[in-house]
Amino acid sequence: MTQGKIIKVSGPLVIASGMQEANIQDICRVGKLGLIGEIIEMRRDQASIQVYEETSGLGPGEPVVTTGEPLSVELGPGLISQMFDGIQRPLDRFKLATHNDFLVRGVEVPSLDRDIKWHFDSTISIGQKVSTGDILGTVKETEVVNHKIMVPYGISGEVVSIASGDFTIDEVVYEIKKLDGSFYKGTLMQKWPVRKARPVSKRLIPEEPLITGQRVIDTFFPVTKGGAAAVPGPFGAGKTVVQHQVAKFANVDIVIYVGCGERGNEMTDVLNEFPELIDPNTGQSIMQRTVLIANTSNMPVAAREASIYTGITMAEYFRDMGYSVAIMADSTSRWAEALREMSGRLEEMPGDEGYPAYLGSRIAEYYERAGRSQALGLPEREGTITAIGAVSPPGGDISEPVTQNTLRIVKVFWGLDAPLAQRRHFPAINWLTSYSLYKDSVGTYIDDKEKTDWNSKITRAMNYLQRESSLEEIVRLVGIDSLSENERLTMEIAKQIREDYLQQNAFDSVDTFTSFAKQEAMLSNILTFADQANHALELGSYFTEIIEGTVAVRDRMARSKYVSEDRLDEIKIISNEITHQIQLILETGGL
């Protein structure tokens, strides 16, 4: 423990002297109030400290004391359904402790509740040899999450005592005789430094798709479990709603939602909506699998930088249990702005647009902690972390450094488009500029598992949208009447794909989520109509005949999105009606 003195305060940056014994990344208590800070630079005996609380009122001469520990999070039962700030202070218990609606400075509240007793069921016996990552037992944390208690990193040996029963997280539950003869007394909780990635046995290639229930994503731009996706877009294009939708309905075991520097109202929406929503995969409340980290725009800037690492460390902990985890960061741009502010105050050489030169490596450090991997220890298990980051480029300009550095790393780009949002087409993901590098592997996975020709269907649907885009310019110049019958039909089919399939209402109880089976049925109907209508044109029918003769069946296709999942057969039989209607047109008109 080292004690120094403040010599300079510059916003969230404090410089202290007499710190020659300290180390970079040590946590400090700054000033008489004991504010939480982290050493980010050492020069001789002077330490530059990033303070995670409001620094107004601090002055030269006040003491700075190091703890000798890096910024760490507590990992154990009690994480799920909780809301923390960027440095893992529990906001609900913080309010009870301080009797204040705002974050009172210098107050320390344990991250995990020390009073709750959790029922621990041991799965191993005394005398058994264990090593890092081995599962010792489970705690039923919520109806849907079985919290697995693992041997902490660096510990191996023989279990000399373990018992099932009710324990708080700081009571000794098991004892291990280590290889050097010493004894390790273990609790239900462990600590881990947030800036250090948790080790795994081996990395695996992501294959299984993350089903989000959002048609434009699952069909054209899928992300795998263990993949990384970016959602850039201008203000009002719907980044937060896309993030919320994925957080609500993704087929994962755990969701970690990091509100990093965005509006407080958005976190309020999450708190209001999530408890009422039912997870379609488990039938339980969505909050029973969710951890929230709130570091809104009115909280100290420095804590934004920590919040992303806090979230990904929690995600790695659940991944090591063998769970699939999705982490949403809204928004990584605000996190990058926090880096820029600290870099400026440290007087570092600026890079593009004032961001630090190491921006790209910091973004890469975050996204590379996502992935599919085999965990350490026994029994053997696989876990995944899917990282989805919103990016808020000023003015929607995706050529700015944060977006460009993000796109170099992630394999999925859901580009939100202001013109689409202005036309009230939501989700406003532009199908011509977005991409997914997992598309082929996901298509092959689905074709093998579901025994469908999904890959060819989405290729055909995208072809219609691309052809529509090239025809739109002609239509704008000389009108739709100048197009051939085939081209007019192409425009009509593309319109159906856009309006009846890609457009989705996040606030409609049925349309908000679409299962893969329903997506396939809806897209198959549109492509069946395309095949039958093109066939009728070849046999001599006119475009107007086809359109007027299929009004009723096309109306049913348009309403398919509002048909509930338990009435899927009503959607599947539409293809028979399409064939019947086109047959009637051929019998009464054409050649």
Curated annotation (Swiss-Prot):
Keywords linked to the UniProt accession: ATP synthesis, ATP-binding, Hydrogen ion transport, Ion transport, Nucleotide-binding, Translocase, Transport
EC numbers, comma separated: 7.1.2.2
Gene Ontology molecular functions: ATP binding; proton-transporting ATP synthase activity, rotational mechanism; proton-transporting ATPase activity, rotational mechanism
Reactions performed catalytically: ATP + H2O + 4 H(+)(in) = ADP + phosphate + 5 H(+)(out)
Family according to the record: Belongs to the ATPase alpha/beta chains family.
GO annotation terms (biological process): proton motive force-driven plasma membrane ATP synthesis
CDD domains: ATP-synt_V_A-type_alpha_C, ATP-synt_V_A-type_alpha_N, V_A-ATPase_A
Phylogenetic lineage: Bacteria, Bacillati, Bacillota, Bacilli, Lactobacillales
Binding-site residues, ATP: G233, P234, F235, G236, A237, G238, K239, T240
Organism: Streptococcus pneumoniae (strain Hungary19A-6)
Name of the protein: V-type ATP synthase alpha chain
